[in-house]
């Protein structure tokens, strides 16, 4: 399935168009809004990457449709607007990478429309998506050390799945499939097939411990909900993770 999604993303890149002149063609925006449905009483440190809400936006200028990571855009103005938040400003954490967290006032509200607006050299663009609820997911509650986990969605239709595994006892993130640049965000968001299961490798569960497994179902913005950028290469997706406690006992 991952190979299929990768091939589909490559096709989209190749079909993005031969011309890349003008703001609308050259600016690529990739956005990912994540939430987590925390059970009462469960709190996790920031290094778990399981935030109640977080939004990441990558901006780049396309000089070659086969490499959307070629020229990240620094110094852009990026803002977030939603009914439950008002207007919030992103901070640039790395060149071309803009972040907003729950500690900044961001809230993930299923059913609300999230809007990201960006301004590059005086030109404006916008992306919007409706935030989905956390999926119903089957995850085993106990495992043998090193055992793979097949997370299955039992309710909801999603274009892709994101997941993260956090070792609570040792306060360590042991695995995730979250994107870390504009290209990998595009590949994650670009799927247009229904994905209902995800294989989490046994390397995420190598020692006896209690783990939190978060699984979220992506809903991706329609191209008509993106303006001011290259609509063939720009995407915005949202997912709320359901959280599951998994125990690996000592052998």
Each model region followed by its residue ranges:
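Short helix-loop boundary/capping segments
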Residues: 133-196
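Ser/Thr/Pro- and often Gln-rich low-complexity regulatory segments
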Residues: 11-121, 126-132, 162-166, 187-191, ...
